[in-house]
Amino acid sequence: MLELNFSQTLGNHCLTINETLPANGITAIFGVSGAGKTSLINAISGLTRPQKGRIVLNGRVLNDAEKGICLTPEKRRVGYVFQDARLFPHYKVRGNLRYGMSKSMVDQFDKLVALLGIEPLLDRLPGSLSGGEKQRVAIGRALLTAPELLLLDEPLASLDIPRKRELLPYLQRLTREINIPMLYVSHSLDEILHLADRVMVLENGQVKAFGALEEVWGSSVMNPWLPKEQQSSILKVTVLEHHPHYAMTALALGDQHLWVNKLDEPLQAALRIRIQASDVSLVLQPPQQTSIRNVLRAKVVNSYDDNGQVEVELEVGGKTLWARISPWARDELAIKPGLWLYAQIKSVSITA
């Protein structure tokens, strides 16, 4: 568990944090440049020293301004991956990985190297590596120090699109197989969507929102980053069954299910899906003989007028689903809170 209760001056603003983060999964730190994202993880790592408050990791006090406690970075058991890999140019990859390696990680070396796909790189110098390869090595080096927490400061920011696509699957694999909590700084919605379990949104050094990805994603806090045409719902689902004849997979959403193209995932595997609001249409009665495979019973929570369109908030299996319809459709269907209807979903994308 990471307990953050501190403040630190940032130019004209003050970074003020009072949150407790669980000791698992990835928490994305999101916001515009200058919001305080990097300053937050620098304070956690010990690169900077807050003027007030405390930082506590798994019961160990890293910072306590009133008591004058400030552990040096090497004593914090916190790994840090920067935007630029910062590898030692005169060491081969193997030497970079072993630099600072904890004795407790010696037996894990081969497993971690395989997990990151860097075994073919072990005898190469950093100068011969691509940007994505360098970052994989940097992540491996940080993990081999046996940290209790891993900080990643926009690790994909300096990479071109092909290299980002190369690295994302490795990061997704790490979240599933390495039981180390991570703080992932980013201003990329795509990275957050594919990696984060939770999101903390910072603005001018203040926490504007903090919670599960699916909750924060659907909140008004994200409106500045999500154009209305990109309004969507993020939902947690599990694999229910596979239909081999039609090559389809059913995903459980509460006591209902969604069909998607066949997935190579075991039954009960947990996944996250994204449904665009523009891909959801509403009907009052269950349609007959329709080509749309996904028709879900839903209850209207509320509706909001927005520049000639209507955003309808629905509840499906205890989850929030958004639909975008016209004012004409709203009036004709008599949309109001508490109304039960059917949501027809034209498209579903898997995010994680």
Curated annotation (Swiss-Prot):
GO terms for biological process: molybdate ion transport; tungstate ion transport. GO terms for molecular function: ABC-type molybdate transporter activity; ATP binding; ATP hydrolysis activity; molybdate ion transmembrane transporter activity. It is a peripheral membrane protein. The keyword Cell membrane applies. SUPFAM superfamilies: MOP-like (SSF50331), P-loop containing nucleoside triphosphate hydrolases (SSF52540). It is an enzyme of class 7 (translocase). One of its GO terms (cellular component) is ATP-binding cassette (ABC) transporter complex, substrate-binding subunit-containing. Pfam families: ABC_tran, TOBE. It catalyses: molybdate(out) + ATP + H2O = molybdate(in) + ADP + phosphate + H(+). InterPro entries: AAA+_ATPase (IPR003593), ABC_transporter-like_ATP-bd (IPR003439), ABC_transporter-like_CS (IPR017871), Mo/tungstate-bd_C_term_dom (IPR008995), ModC_ABC_ATP-bd (IPR011868), Molybdenum_import_ModC (IPR050334), Mop_domain (IPR004606), P-loop_NTPase (IPR027417). ATP binds at residues 31-38. Gene3D superfamilies: 2.40.50.100, P-loop containing nucleotide triphosphate hydrolases. The complex is composed of two ATP-binding proteins (ModC), two transmembrane proteins (ModB) and a solute-binding protein (ModA). Belongs to the ABC transporter superfamily. Molybdate importer (TC 3.A.1.8) family. This is Molybdenum import ATP-binding protein ModC. It comes from Escherichia coli (strain K12).
